[in-house]
Amino acid sequence: MASETIVNLLDLDAEGLVAYCGGLGEKAFRAKQLQRWIHQYNAADFDGMTDLAKSLREKLKGRAVIGTPDILSDHVSADGTRKWLINVGNGNAVETVFIPEETRGTLCVSSQAGCAVNCRFCSTGKQGFSRNLSTGEIVGQLRMAEFALRASLGRAPGPNGKAERVITNVVMMGMGEPLLNYSAVVPAMRLMLDDNAYGLSRRRVTLSTSGVVPMMDRLGAELPVALAVSLHAPNDALRDELVPLNKKHPLRELMAACQRYLKVAPRDFITFEYCMLDGVNDTEAHARELLALTRDVPCKFNLIPFNPFPESGLLRSKTEQIKRFAQVLIDAGVVTTIRKTRGDDIDAACGQLAGAVKDRTRLAERTGATKIIEVRAV
């Protein structure tokens, strides 16, 4: 008789957990109890789940686990930004970054090891695509970070109330293109939103995409969360060069998809992310082109100073030029922000994720890895 497959319960959203418990002959309410123990009380095993029948706990011990990330490093920046490097096997590592602010705490989560989109200004794409992360590996980043942060503040695990939660916002802006890992990302986000798990609102969970148009439509139909689009260019010729996916889904299609998404979105605008590249996409003429491109899409712009990496052949736009570019947008009435660099002293700034593993040989020896992927968020 073949051995039974061990299930990582972090891979199951509420519906999946109900089905799993049903397969064990248990009622649906047991799934809610399990979910609360795992996602609200940070249970590491089944013994402490005291409101579950002992018979169920014994069943679970032989059939299921509560997976936890294999943390390779944990660093805190001078500005409070915290970065975890997580081993996801076969020499691959991804990073999770927490950015504290006065009124909120934002967690940047990865969805893939590597990335196939290969944007010109993004180091992750230069490393190639390795694999999709599982639902458990994605939501596990939130679980790990939330309870690590609570522990550092002396807060005990428990149901998420406003006074308890440390992470108030999640952005799917780490390594990878989330919409190319849709089947794992959506269940993970369902758990982020579930009141029996993390209880975040749809306005506080943001998915960032480079423009996978068919999956944008599917997300809008199934789980419309806040949406950010990695735009980076005001015309197809330049975007074809910077974001090769544009050749498959050009700007006309992308803008139409944004309009469709806004009909169901929890926010009344799309956030367009725009990496500022010196002499490439940063002139006032480019800004005016952007205004024409997006005139029918309610939006805000987030201008991102480029964080250079070796062999990119690109430079960060000068600060004064970024301000001039922003002013063109602001003068037209478009809300525009310039992203503040956070965590750059621990290589956790935008574009630096997992980009500073200084001694690869020692890290590989420690993890049994043959390679380490450098991760950079766009």
UniProtKB/Swiss-Prot annotation:
Domain Radical SAM core: 101-345
Disulphide-bonded residues: C108-C350
Cofactor note: Binds 1 [4Fe-4S] cluster. The cluster is coordinated with 3 cysteines and an exchangeable S-adenosyl-L-methionine.
Transmembrane domains' residue ranges: none
Active site: E95 (proton acceptor), C350 (s-methylcysteine intermediate)
Listed GO CC annotations: cytoplasm
Cofactors named for this entry: [4Fe-4S] cluster
The reaction(s) this protein catalyses: adenosine(2503) in 23S rRNA + 2 reduced [2Fe-2S]-[ferredoxin] + 2 S-adenosyl-L-methionine = 2-methyladenosine(2503) in 23S rRNA + 5'-deoxyadenosine + L-methionine + 2 oxidized [2Fe-2S]-[ferredoxin] + S-adenosyl-L-homocysteine; adenosine(37) in tRNA + 2 reduced [2Fe-2S]-[ferredoxin] + 2 S-adenosyl-L-methionine = 2-methyladenosine(37) in tRNA + 5'-deoxyadenosine + L-methionine + 2 oxidized [2Fe-2S]-[ferredoxin] + S-adenosyl-L-homocysteine
EC number(s) recorded for this UniProt protein: 2.1.1.192
EC primary class: transferase
CDD domains assigned: Radical_SAM
Binding residues for S-adenosyl-L-methionine: G176, E177, S208, S230, L231, H232, N307
Binding residues annotated for [4Fe-4S] cluster, in chain numbering: C115, C119, C122
GO molecular function: 4 iron, 4 sulfur cluster binding; metal ion binding; rRNA (adenine(2503)-C2-)-methyltransferase activity; rRNA binding; tRNA (adenine(37)-C2)-methyltransferase activity; tRNA binding
Alphabetically ordered keywords of this record: 4Fe-4S, Cytoplasm, Disulfide bond, Iron, Iron-sulfur, Metal-binding, Methyltransferase, rRNA processing, S-adenosyl-L-methionine, Transferase, tRNA processing
Classification via InterPro entries: Aldolase_TIM, Methyltransferase_A, RlmN_N, RNA_MTrfase_RlmN, rRNA_lsu_MTrfase_RlmN/Cfr, rSAM
HAMAP family cross-referenced by the UniProt entry: RNA_methyltr_RlmN (MF_01849)
Family named by the database record: Belongs to the radical SAM superfamily. RlmN family.
Name this polypeptide is given: Dual-specificity RNA methyltransferase RlmN
Species per Swiss-Prot/TrEMBL record: Burkholderia thailandensis (strain ATCC 700388 / DSM 13276 / CCUG 48851 / CIP 106301 / E264)
Gene name per UniProt: rlmN
